[in-house]
Regions:
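Bacterial N-terminal signal peptides that target proteins for export
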Residues: 1-8
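Non-globular disordered terminal and juxtamembrane segments underlying protein topogenesis/assembly
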Residues: 21-22
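Primary mode marks residue(s) on the alpha4-beta5-alpha5 output face of response regulator receiver
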Residues: 25-56, 63-180
Length: 180
């Protein structure tokens, strides 16, 4: 009888230990965020990732005035867990976040707020389309925070350089939110 009980209880204890060691989903206070990029109430963090990659800019003629400017073309980044594992990718256009599990979403920028000098702005994105079952399923907002680098090149952009592309490195935290 003791052997049968031990064989039944041991796996239950192991499962209980595993369950109690799982960390709860992180919570991120919106209090320190600029109002423009705060996620609306009624949402919880579903996932977080660190985007590490490049942003491409192209020297183009200005649309509404004379001269040229560096124009954002798109990102190409790996999405990493806090432990350094690649969990997905971020690319565009259109802005697309794709999980290694095959789920992905596209989004539209709602707002930006200034970040530090030399850093791309903080950003709030609303999900437009989502496909696949997995990590991206049910995500309604994406917040870009803790940005480093990624701003347009400082080198001159003129008619002689029109069509030239420059790639700059960047890093940012992406916080994925779901409705409660």
């Amino acid at each position: 009888m003791f052997t049968k009980t031990a064989l039944f209880v041991a796996p239950l204890l192991a499962l209980t230990a595993c369950a109690s060691s799982m960390a709860p989903a992180p919570t991120f206070s919106q209090a320190g965020m600029p109002a423009a990029v705060q996620v609306p109430a009624g949402h919880k963090v579903a996932m977080e990732a660190v985007g590490v990659g490049q942003i491409t800019y192209e020297c183009r003629a200005r649309k509404d005035m004379a001269g040229h400017e560096w124009v954002f073309v798109g990102p190409d980044a790996k999405l990493m867990s806090r432990s350094g594992q690649v969990v997905g990718a971020y690319y565009g256009p259109p802005a697309t976040w794709e999980s290694n599990d095959g789920s992905k979403l596209t989004g539209t920028q709602l707002a930006v707020a200034p970040a530090g000098a030399g850093d791309i702005p903080l950003q709030l994105v609303k999900t437009q389309t989502a496909v696949g079952m997995g990590a991206m399923q049910g995500v309604t907002y994406i917040q870009r925070v803790a940005t480093r680098g990624g701003v347009a090149p400082t080198m001159p952009c003129d008619g002689a350089k029109q069509g030239t592309k420059q790639i700059v490195n960047y890093q940012a935290d992406y916080i994925f939110w779901k409705a409660i």
